[in-house]
From Swiss-Prot:
Domain of life: Eukaryota
Sorted UniProt keywords: Disulfide bond, Hormone, Metal-binding, Pyrrolidone carboxylic acid, Secreted, Signal, Zinc
Record Gene3D superfamilies: 1.20.1250.10
Its job: Growth hormone plays an important role in growth control and is involved in the regulation of several anabolic processes. Implicated as an osmoregulatory substance important for seawater adaptation.
Protein's GO biological process: animal organ development; growth hormone receptor signaling pathway; positive regulation of growth; positive regulation of receptor signaling pathway via JAK-STAT; response to nutrient levels
GO molecular function: growth hormone activity; growth hormone receptor binding; metal ion binding
Signal peptide from the UniProt entry: 1-18
Binding site for Zn(2+): 37, 188
Protein name: Somatotropin
Source organism per UniProt: Pseudocaranx dentex (White trevally)
Protein's cellular compartments: Secreted
Membership in a protein family: Belongs to the somatotropin/prolactin family.
Length: 206
């Protein structure tokens, strides 16, 4: 009886130890899936907010937003798809992490219900942790220093989230949702390109 128990435990231990440890591609797949979900949610929130506006208000807010900028624009990132493709995997990861971090607090001010905002904040925190794991597994001394040293932290939001009324609140809400959608699109692009670089896929063009 004892011999049978020992054999059974040995088989169970062997089964556990043979389970594959998540590799880069698995971690990247999880990160890309999470950011894709966040990007879709950002698009939906923005579309819902726009649909609640009058046509004239939409045009006016869009015109104002084009002349304005997002707080995260202080984070230096590739200016176009060509620069994105030339950037190292680590640099894309570092930028993605900063963009995600810049929304962990500000996501609490997104228009919508408390449950929605809470879910978004939780997803952002999970994504940041996943990206940090990828940075740790992909960093290589000199590259870390050269890439991370060029990425300044975004400054505080100041009075961006101060309670406003009327048209000002509407404008701030529009800008916040537009910036959130824009940044989630950036992160999804960067993580997708970085994932492709480390795979066997020959074509990583955008």
């Amino acid at each position: 009886m004892l011999d049978r128990v020992v054999v059974l435990l040995s088989v169970l231990c062997l089964g556990v130890s043979s389970q594959p440890i998540p590799n880069n591609q698995h971690l990247f797949s999880m990160a890309v899936s999470r950011i894709h979900h966040l990007h879709l949610r950002a698009q939906r929130l923005f579309a819902n907010f726009e649909s609640s506006l009058q046509s004239d208000d939409q045009r006016q807010l869009n015109k104002i937003f084009l002349q304005d900028f997002c707080n995260s624009d202080y984070i230096i990132s590739p200016i176009d798809k060509h620069e994105t493709q030339r950037s190292s995997v680590l640099k894309l990861l570092l930028i993605s992490k900063q963009l995600v971090e810049s929304w962990e607090i500000s996501s609490h001010f997104l228009p919508g219900g408390l449950a929605e905002r809470s879910q978004i904040s939780s997803r952002l925190a999970e994504l940041r942790e996943g990206i940090q794991m990828l940075i740790t597994t992909n960093q290589e001394g000199a590259e870390v220093f050269s890439d991370s040293s060029t990425l300044p932290l975004a400054p505080p939001f100041g009075n961006f989230f101060q309670t406003q009324g009327g048209d000002e609140l509407q404008r701030r809400s529009y800008e916040l949702l537009a910036c959130f959608k824009k940044d989630m699109h950036k992160v999804e692009t960067y993580l997708t390109v970085a994932k492709c670089r480390l795979s066997t896929e020959a074509n990583c063009t955008l």
